[in-house]
A protein has these predicted regions:
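Positions within the helices of HEAT/ARM-like alpha-solenoid repeats
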Residues: 5-12, 45-52, 65, 77-81, ...
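Short, charged, low-hydrophobicity "junction" segments
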Residues: 9, 53, 152-159
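Amphipathic alpha-helical scaffolding segments comprising HEAT/armadillo-like alpha-solenoid repeats
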Residues: 1, 23-42, 60-74, 79, ...
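Structural signature of alpha-helical solenoid repeat scaffolds
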Residues: 14-22, 58, 74, 87, ...
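Mid-chain, structured segments of secreted extracytoplasmic proteins
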Residues: 2-56
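Start-of-helix signal in alpha-solenoid helical-repeat scaffolds, especially tetratricopeptide repeats
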Residues: 11, 176-179, 199
Length: 215
């Protein structure tokens, strides 16, 4: 496994190869290396080895890797590395795969959280509606991930949803970060140019939080 015993030298060499190929900036070399990693990924069964290869694809992969990486999004052991690799690839196809996987609600809460975090990291606006539909989870950690993602990808269309969640949380700091997510979304909406909506939300938040004794 990567990092253990005799394989550590192999890991070091492969990491060096990845960085060398990326530094050269030659597309043919990058594509050939990515395809070699994809073939290796299909042949190995060890979780750590697969995760190591996926991390290399995170560094040099492009659209040729999306289909294969998508197949690991429902695997609890590899959903994290796969989701992070797709978010790093950042192509339209990679983004669509992340959103489509979340829409299917397959996998487990753990794999869904990994996908949601990747969506938040790359700020995929197309995920807004599916994330809104996931609000209200009894799993506090899931709710936290959904709220954080909406604060990163949302628009004025999500203001009322996050306002309601923040109000329910009493406008105070708690495990799901509802109030912080709402404030972050207001800032995002302001940056998007929807000034009136952002100002209205901010004023409403100030009024209600003051009434609740939180300011």
């Amino acid at each position: 496994a990567p990092g253990k015993g005799s394989n550590s030298n192999v890991d070091y060499a492969l990491s060096g190869l990845t960085h060398y190929v990326m530094a050269k900036g030659e597309e043919n070399a990058r594509l050939a290396t990515a395809n070699a990693y994809l073939k290796a990924l299909d042949k190995v069964s060890d979780r750590e080895t697969k995760a190591f290869i996926i991390r290399q694809l995170q560094l040099l992969g492009k659209d040729e890797c999306v289909h294969t990486l998508a197949s690991y999004l429902n695997d609890e052991n590899l959903s994290g590395p796969a989701a992070r690799a797709l978010s790093a690839i950042r192509t339209d196809n990679a983004k669509k795969v992340l959103v489509a996987s979340l829409m299917r609600r397959s996998g487990t809460p753990k794999t869904q959280k990994d996908i949601i975090r990747a969506i938040a990291d790359v700020q995929i606006a197309d995920a807004e509606n599916v994330l809104k539909a996931m609000l209200g989870s009894s799993d506090e950690n899931m709710q936290k991930e959904v709220l954080y993602a909406l604060s990163r990808v949302g628009s004025k269309a999500s203001l009322s949803d996050l306002a309601a969640v923040a109000e329910k949380a009493g406008y105070k700091m708690e495990k799901t970060g509802a109030n912080e997510a709402y404030i972050a979304l207001i800032k995002r909406v302001l940056e998007q140019g929807d000034t009136k909506d952002a100002e209205k939300a901010a004023n409403d938040l100030l009024k209600k939080s003051t009434k609740a004794g939180m300011t």
